[in-house]
Amino acid sequence: MTRLRDWSGLLLLLWLFCTSPAAAGEEYFARYALPRNAASVDIGVQPLGFPAAMIGALVQRDRILKRRLEELGQPLATFAFRRGSDMLDLLADDRLEAGLLGDLPTILLAARTDVAIAGLTKRSATALVARQEGLLANLQGKRLAYVPDSSAHYTLLQALASVGLSEQDVTLVPLAIDEMPAALAQGRIDGFAAWEPAPTIALASLPQARIVFRGPSSDYLVLTRRFVKRHPEAARHLVAALIRALEWMRQNRKNIESAVRWAMHDGSAFSGQAPALTLAQAVTIARREIIEVPAAPAIPAAIGDRQPLLGEFNFLQRLGKLPANTSWERLAMAFAYDGLQQVSAAPARYRPYVFDYEP
């Protein structure tokens, strides 16, 4: 009888394991169980990437934003994602209203559904980091880690193309961004393409690490066009929160450090790991990649006929990474959203320069 109970217990544990989300291959974000067209304003944030983590941390602690959305009957809800591409299905299916996305996920989303690009949240260079000097000239056959369908994926494609190679000429290793520095140090990969803080962590912890390629990279606050049409006032309050986040950090270093600490707290709560980045390193990244970017979150105007993301769009289209019928006009329409101008024209209503954050 005792043996029967033991076997019953083992079978129960086995059944629980086999039916768990992890064992069934269910994505981590499935547990959010986001419904379509919820009353709340649901935003996807990225607590493992900088400076996106800081902007997400400030938006979700913004008391002014929360009060305004509550008054509209649309409470704020934020959800953490490991990468922007994990949000795309949810944004396309009205399960998220907005997300902080890199350039490639923004393009991929615009190819699928109508979106509004509300503002710039990062402008910098994504890096290809390697253990070996001169690796760029000898990429063929190397093990290169990347995050599929991310801005770093685009940088990796650029690096390969610059030496006449394609994805088929290397061994691609899909890997979480926070695992890349350790994998490089352990020799499990020969290099990785990533956004901050992974390059900074690798360079600080591994003397042999080198940046062998940099590619331009940008992040955006992206809203679904359906959300903007149905709830234009709520959309404008989100834009005001983005302005507040950047302007508050620009006031002084103490504010930047507070944003970093909140972001690190959120990242650790999400990943279950202690931050690998120091406070000073995170402040440097934030200053370089968004705080000191002139006029941000305003998106830089076109230079001649050179529109934002047009080069990236054309490059990805040539490589067959976009649906064949995708037109540039869809992305151009996304950049035409004038929420920033509307908020800036009514400061008394949207309070973009008044600050009230939860500790």
Which role fits each region the language model picked out?
Residues 105, 172-173, 178-274:
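Pocket-lining segment of extracytoplasmic ligand-binding domains
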